[in-house]
Design a protein with these regions (language model features):
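Cytochrome P450 catalytic-core helices
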Residues: 42, 46
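A cross-kingdom marker of C-terminal helix-rich interaction/assembly modules
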Residues: 1-33, 37-39, 49-52, 58-188
Length: 188
């Protein structure tokens, strides 16, 4: 394993440790909107780890990790020979093929990172802004991974007991894929 890989993994793990402490403190104090923001931050690390793990070009993987270590944005060379920024959306679309729930966590979490009507969740159900298909898909994922009752309406109050479970699912999957990076393996 290279020095760059070591440093990248250290950065990801440091962020994850802080996220874990933060989400538990926030949850214990009933600060649910910020819990969802922290969940979204953990997902941000996860999509990057997945993206790297799917690259078969180890040199490209190292280059992207080096960009992170140096505090720079990720980019890729286009067919025209120009550098193009790799966006969160690019990585979410890529990762969503492997983990279908990622897009839902990302999209919903963004509503709590950026100022939006989701911050009025005490008065308005932010899940109501989603399509019936999206709500049904979220309930299906919550049921599949965490035994969320199909008959439960999707509200913040009903989701709250599952929030830490969703966080742990994202975090543990990320750490598993981080081990693959450490060993220079491609993700399955």
């Amino acid at each position: 394993m290279s020095e760059i890989t070591d440093k990248f993994i250290e950065i990801v793990k440091s962020r994850s440790i802080e996220n874990r402490k933060s989400i538990h403190l926030l949850f214990d104090n009933g600060i649910i909107g910020n819990c969802i923001s922290v969940l979204r931050q953990e997902l941000d690390s996860f999509i990057r780890v997945i993206y790297l793990g799917k690259l078969d070009d180890i040199n490209e993987r190292q280059r992207l990790m080096r960009l992170t270590v140096n505090g720079q944005e990720w980019n890729e060379l286009t067919i025209n020979g120009k550098l193009r920024k790799i966006t969160d959306r690019d990585m979410v679309n890529f990762a969503n093929v492997l983990f279908g729930y990622i897009n839902y966590v990302y999209k919903f979490g963004c509503g709590f990172i950026h100022l939006s009507n989701n911050h009025d969740f005490q008065n308005e159900n932010p899940f109501e802004t989603l399509s019936e298909y999206d709500k049904s898909s979220i309930i299906t994922y919550l049921n599949q991974y965490h035994s969320y009752p199909f008959e439960n309406e999707l509200t913040i109050e009903n989701f709250k007991p599952y929030l830490l479970l969703v966080y742990e699912k994202v975090s543990s999957n990320m750490l598993c894929h981080l081990d693959e990076l450490k060993e220079n393996r491609m993700s399955d």
